[in-house]
Amino acid sequence: MKHTLALFLKTGCVVCIFLLLCLAAVHHFKPALSSLPVFSRFERKLPIYCVDTDKPQVAISFDAAWGNEDTETLLSILDKYNVKTTFFMTGGWIESYPEDVKKIAASGHDLGNHSENHKQMSQLSSDECLAEIQKPHDKVKELTGTEMTLFRPPYGDYNNTLIESANALGYYVVQWSVDSLDWKDYGADSIVDTI
């Protein structure tokens, strides 16, 4: 019994000494730890997903990055129902279909920027982000006179560097709150069920 009590007291003393050393170490190194960038006040910047309105509304948008085979039909349907949307266009699409860009603008739809080359924007430097945003901006301005202010990053891929770069060029970075998954080509019924 004496042996068990002595072992218990020794173990308790060792644990107490260890805890005191840990507390002393934390207290001693606390100022150094708080000055490390890892412990800085890093704030993740977020794009716009939705906005508050006085009445229930839906914002519809389209990404124009590859073909234009449905553009005329789409514009006709939107016109028939007096619906205005935003078309987010890549630089390549703008170059390939300048007349469509003009028609979209003339129909009263918003023109949005979807980057020059549809790259993973979070993998780019600030200078590369600026170039990816500025090039399509200049193309649309030359074609339509429109100063675009909305940027949708390809793949929904963003980071602080992208958002800061876009903001520096006068852009708001916007995403979506509902993805129709139309790009998976599941058909109209699937799209309706999704949204």
For the regions a language model picked out, list residue spans one by one.
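Hydrophobic single-pass membrane-insertion segments
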Residues: 25-35
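Active-site beta->alpha N-cap acidic-glycine motif
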Residues: 34-121, 132-139, 148
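N-terminal Lys/Arg-rich, disordered targeting/topogenic segments
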Residues: 1-9
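A general, composition-driven signal for non-globular sequence regions
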Residues: 4, 21-24, 108
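N-terminal non-cleavable signal-anchor helices
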Residues: 6, 15-18, 49-52
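Catalytic domains of cell-wall/extracellular-matrix polysaccharide-remodeling enzymes
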Residues: 73, 95, 119-195
